[in-house]
C-alpha cells in the first residue's frame, strides 16, 4: 500500500503552512459580490476579483467581519465615503487568512481603507465621463427639444421612494393637470442599474406618449449612488430620444447621470417645482399674448 495522508492530515498540513506563511495580516483588494448581516451581528461577505473569461471571476473567497469590529469598520467607511458597504463596491481590506479543516479558506477582515474605495469610485466616474465624451454622445440628450408645455411625464423611480411621493405631492399642489406615468425601478442596490435601464427601455417603447422623462430618487443617505456614474446607464440617458430631467437627491457631488441629462436638479421636489414654474411661465405668456 502506498504511503498516504488522510484527508484530515492533508487539511492540517495546509492549515499549518498557511498559518506559518501568513502569520501577520495582509492588505487585499477585491470587490464585494455579496454581503449580509446575520442575526448575531456578524457580517458575511463574498469577495471576488473580476476579469475571468465569460464573466467568471478570476478569484473568489469568503470573508467575515465579526460583530465586535463591524460597527467600527462599517461606520467609519460610510462616514468617509458616503457609501454603505454593499455589493459592487471595491475595497482594500486588512485581513487575517484563515483555513479550517471543515470550512476551508476564508478571510477575517480587521479593517477597510476607505481612501481606496473613494479613489476607485472617482476613477470609474472619470472613465465613464471620458468614454462618453470620446464617443461623442455627451451632449445628445441636452439637444433634445423640450416642449414649452411639459405635461405628459414618464417617471422612472421606485413606487416606495419618498422622493417619488414628494414629487407627486408637489405637482398636486399646482393648478395644472399633469399626466404622470410611473415606470417602477430599483433606485439603489446591486440591481439598480439594470432596473433603471429596463425602465427607460419601456419608456422608449411608448415615447410618443410623453413630453419628457423624470428620473428621481430621494431620501436616506448618499449611499448606493454608484449606478448613476456607471457607463451603461449614463450612455442610455445621454442617447435617450426624450429629454430627461434628473432629481437624484444628493448634494455633495454631481453624478455623471446629472451631467448628461437634459436638465439636472438636486431633488425630486425641485424637479416638480421647475415643471410648475415652466407651466406658470407659459400661462403668463399666453395671458399677455391675449391682451
Where are these regions (language model features)?
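Acidic, two-metal ion nucleic-acid-processing modules in DNA metabolism proteins
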Residues: 1-215
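Short glycine/threonine-rich loop/turn motifs
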Residues: 150, 154-291
